[in-house]
């Protein structure tokens, strides 16, 4: 099992959207960065855990967690000319972009703002602090435990 940080803008898809999706399961799509796409396609697996990070807001923060319930598959938006994620170079037989399905696990009692992440020695090596724009990032088990503790989670 691996752990990932998934960045999302809550105006498009926030932790509450994931919670309120049918069965708590949502397609996590719209990735249009090759490095993030490669991780999603090649490394993210069913059963992996995810931290949900709200970006594009006044105070970016880790707000909750989810679990991958379907491994990478072709992002259908790339084939839809009406979608903002349409890619005319993509073909169903050779897709360029991928998505996964995630299931809501929890909203943390307290969000963990980026400013606090930067001040926390145990999180100094996080990919988030080196490659901030990357929307799919690996997280170590030690980082996962530290983050959950800082967010007020007392178990798991």
What name fits each language-model region?
Residues 1-10, 71-74, 116-118, 123-156:
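Mixed-charge, low-complexity intrinsically disordered regions
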Residues 12, 59, 75:
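Flexible, glycine-rich phosphate/dinucleotide-binding loops
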Residues 16-18, 78-79, 113-115, 147-150:
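A short secondary-structure junction signal
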Residues 53-59:
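Short, charged beta-turn/beta-strand-edge "cap" motif at the junction between a beta-strand
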Residues 7-8, 54, 104-106, 138:
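Pocket-edge structural micro-motifs
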Residues 1-46, 143, 151-156:
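Compositionally biased, charged N-terminal/linker segments
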Residues 64-134:
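Aromatic- and Lys/Arg-enriched surface recognition patch
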């Amino acid at each position: 099992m691996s752990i990932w940080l998934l960045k999302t803008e809550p105006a498009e898809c926030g932790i509450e959207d994931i919670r309120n999706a049918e069965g708590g399961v949502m397609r996590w799509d719209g990735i249009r960065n090759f490095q993030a796409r490669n991780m999603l396609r090649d490394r993210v697996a069913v059963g992996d855990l995810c931290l949900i990070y709200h970006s594009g807001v006044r105070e970016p923060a880790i707000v909750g967690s989810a679990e991958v319930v379907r491994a990478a598959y072709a992002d259908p938006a790339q084939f839809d000319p009406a979608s903002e994620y349409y890619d005319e170079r993509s073909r169903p037989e050779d897709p360029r972009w991928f998505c996964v399905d995630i299931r809501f696990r929890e909203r943390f009692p307290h969000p963990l703002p980026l400013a606090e992440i930067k001040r926390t020695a145990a999180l100094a090596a996080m990919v988030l602090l080196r490659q901030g724009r990357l929307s799919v990032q690996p997280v170590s088990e030690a980082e996962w435990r530290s983050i959950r503790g800082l967010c007020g989670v007392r178990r798991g």
